[in-house]
């Protein structure tokens, strides 16, 4: 591929780390990374009173499953709370194709934000790799941000570290959206 839009995983890693190449782990269980969109971990996702206090109307679990790498919630878990749920059975591995879920996740986030007081929590086990990747893809696809801008906005509001496979998928999305003229100039 050629073109000025092409970015590397290293370019994105440089935005995520400090000058010495160190990464920070999340200091809070949950952060509002852009208006009405929160990224968080399993503990906040499983704390329905806390979600209600935050005004969360929708929960997107980017790590649905029963293993130690996943968060074992489902629509039934939230049914009496009035919270709308979507689960994605994603693994936090470089080989996992999270981009296959970008559109579905973006539709769900849009559904939440279309409600007058809608707020969405996008979470995974730690709120560090899978869930921020989905929010970054959303900002690119629906708010026409390039990958560096979207990643920077999320990183300014939460310590994140998507794995290199997810960063590569975001670079591919950036190249595709740029070629289609779907990013802000």
UniProtKB/Swiss-Prot annotation:
GO terms for cellular component: cytoplasm; cytoskeleton; cytosol; immunological synapse; motile cilium; nucleoplasm; nucleus. It catalyses: O-phospho-L-tyrosyl-[protein] + H2O = L-tyrosyl-[protein] + phosphate; O-phospho-L-seryl-[protein] + H2O = L-seryl-[protein] + phosphate; O-phospho-L-threonyl-[protein] + H2O = L-threonyl-[protein] + phosphate. Its EC number is 3.1.3.16, 3.1.3.48. The keyword Nucleus applies. The keyword Transcription regulation does not apply. One of its GO terms (molecular function) is protein serine/threonine phosphatase activity. The active site is at 124 (phosphocysteine intermediate). It is an enzyme of class 3 (hydrolase). InterPro entries: Atypical_DUSP_subfamA, Dual-sp_phosphatase_cat-dom, Prot-tyrosine_phosphatase-like, Tyr_Pase_AS, Tyr_Pase_dom, TYR_PHOSPHATASE_DUAL_dom. Gene3D superfamilies: Protein tyrosine phosphatase superfamily (3.90.190.10). It holds the Pfam family DSPc. One of its GO terms (biological process) is cellular response to epidermal growth factor stimulus. Keywords: Cell projection, Cilium, Cytoplasm, Cytoskeleton, Flagellum, Hydrolase, Nucleus, Protein phosphatase. It is found in: Nucleus; Cytoplasm, Cytoskeleton, Flagellum axoneme. Residues 28-179 form the Tyrosine-protein phosphatase domain. Shows activity both for tyrosine-protein phosphate and serine-protein phosphate, but displays a strong preference toward phosphotyrosines. Specifically dephosphorylates and inactivates ERK1 and ERK2. Belongs to the protein-tyrosine phosphatase family. Non-receptor class dual specificity subfamily. Microtubule inner protein component of sperm flagellar doublet microtubules. Interacts with VRK3; this interaction activates DUSP3 phosphatase activity. This is Dual specificity protein phosphatase 3.
